[in-house]
């Protein structure tokens, strides 16, 4: 629907579709020229995790789409973190496909519209996505060390952590 309206308003506009790499049924369908069913899908973008594209919309997509690209789940995770931290917006993973796709496109000095949609994400999923995003950005990591069992050793490690302006988020001591 969006591609049809965009082309109707401006026939010269370039419309680029985006799918998760783990659920790229439309991309595969466009390659073959007919609706393709994937054997399986694997993506965190659950709102677009379909094996088969809609047969009724397929002809419109063929007619109006200039290109289609895929993005990986890690890119969606980083896009989520960017939206939360930089724009104070919560957008579900499927709704972030266009944001993640921008990293693949040459958009400097161009007018670009990136459609964001949906905020249907429970707090457990949100927490997991934020955690993974921080790991992907090398902002948190796990360190496992073995210390002698004597007083002051943990304090010594804490001193090293503090000396590099870092924080301990969680500590497991066995």
Question: What do these predicted ranges mean?
Answer:
Residues 8-23:
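Short, acidic/small-residue loops that bind anionic groups at enzyme active sites
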Residues 38, 58, 107-110, 115, ...:
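Active-site loop ensemble at the mouth of alpha/beta enzyme cores that anchors a bound cofactor
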Residues 41-44, 50-63, 132-147:
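Active-site pocket-lining segment
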Residues 54-110:
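Active-site-adjacent helical/loop segments in soluble small-molecule enzymes
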Residues 6, 26-44, 48, 132:
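Anionic-ligand binding region
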Residues 1-3, 23-27, 94-102, 115, ...:
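Short glycine/serine/threonine-rich phosphate/pyrophosphate-binding segments
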Residues 126-174:
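A conserved regulatory-domain signal marking ACT and ACT-like small-molecule sensing domains
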């Amino acid at each position: 629907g969006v591609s049809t309206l965009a082309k109707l308003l401006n026939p010269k506009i370039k419309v680029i579709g985006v799918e998760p790499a783990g659920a790229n049924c439309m991309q595969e369908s466009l390659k073959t020229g007919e609706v393709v069913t994937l054997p399986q899908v694997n993506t965190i973008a659950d709102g677009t995790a379909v094996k088969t594209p809609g047969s009724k919309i397929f002809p419109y997509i063929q007619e109006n789409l200039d290109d289609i690209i895929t993005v990986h789940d890690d890119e969606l995770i980083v896009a989520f973190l960017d939206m939360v931290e930089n724009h104070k917006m919560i957008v579900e993973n499927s709704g972030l496909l266009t944001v993640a796709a921008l990293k693949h496109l040459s958009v400097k000095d161009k007018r670009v519209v990136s459609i964001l949609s949906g905020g249907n994400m429970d707090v457990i999923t949100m927490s997991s996505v934020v955690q993974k995003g921080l790991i992907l950005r090398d902002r948190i990591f796990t360190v496992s060390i073995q210390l002698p069992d004597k007083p002051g050793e943990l304090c010594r490690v804490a001193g090293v952590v503090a000396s590099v302006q870092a924080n301990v988020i969680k500590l497991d001591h066995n």
